[in-house]
């Protein structure tokens, strides 16, 4: 796949990165449930996805809502917010799946 700067990146490399990001998004759930740090990994994910948004031309329609939903997780810190947190995680996983389909067909 040709990305910004005319760099030709192998589809396998992008697929592996998307799989890793998907796993990291999913891991936010048990981290929060167990009282582990979930905010620092979330910040790292946001940084990576923002960078991906700058590199993957034509994927902004998916990456922007993904960034918005992940950023919104920082607001869901109360115990009663957990089900919304969980639902948002699964919506984000759906967006990463949609992104993979758009890239690979």
Please describe what each predicted stretch is.
Residues 1, 42, 102-105:
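Short intrinsically disordered terminal tails
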Residues 1-39, 93, 97-98:
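Short terminal alpha-helical segments
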Residues 1-5, 9, 50, 54-57, ...:
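Generic preference for well-ordered secondary structure
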Residues 5-12, 36, 57-64, 79, ...:
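Short, solvent-exposed segments of well-ordered alpha helices
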Residues 23-69:
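Amphipathic alpha-helical interaction modules
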Residues 68-105:
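Amphipathic alpha-helical binding modules
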